[in-house]
Amino acid sequence: MACDQQAELRRVFELFDRDGDGRITREELTESLERLGMPVHREELAATIARIDANGDGCVDMDEFTQLYETVMRVDGGGGGGGGACDVDEASMREAFDVFDRNGDGFITVDELGAVLASLGIKQGRTAEDCGRMIGQVDRDGDGRVDFLEFKQMMRGGAFATLR
């Protein structure tokens, strides 16, 4: 994994690791997902953590988080196989897009981006100017909004690259 990908992954991990102890607890994961508007059932969350938690401590550390990322990237990366992984990838991308597209109009606006970033406690999105710059970095057609295609391209190129 490239250094910039490792740094990006570390930033994402730290967003979920609210107390900064180097482990994402079930509570931290629940809280982060709820802030994104993605409530998860306890059983589903427990199963997810059990799949990720290689050392069995009930939490997700940076190594386990990295392993999960690498596994997802191998599945997403294409390379043959049936269409199943692509369908899951598309559905996951749509679900993530819908978190940001709060009014459901098919676009992520400056205000919507700001609201989601604020709910996550991300400082870089505190002003409309910051959010406008972030959107400008991925807005291919120049309409001042991010559509689903632009969102997918951004996610495949590095989901949090605009937060630097």
UniProtKB/Swiss-Prot annotation:
Ca(2+) 2 binds at residues 53, 55, 57, 59, 64. Ca(2+) 3 binds at residues 101, 103, 105, 112. SMART domains: EFh. Ca(2+) 1 binds at residues 17, 19, 21, 23, 28. InterPro entries: EF-hand-dom_pair, EF_Hand_1_Ca_BS, EF_hand_dom, EF_hand_pair_protein_CML-like. It comes from the Eukaryota. The keyword Repeat applies. GO terms for molecular function: calcium ion binding. Residues 4-39, 40-75, 88-123, 126-161 form the EF-hand domain. The keyword Metal-binding applies. Keywords: Calcium, Metal-binding, Repeat. PANTHER family: EF-HAND CALCIUM-BINDING DOMAIN CONTAINING PROTEIN. This is Probable calcium-binding protein CML17. It comes from Oryza sativa subsp. japonica (Rice).
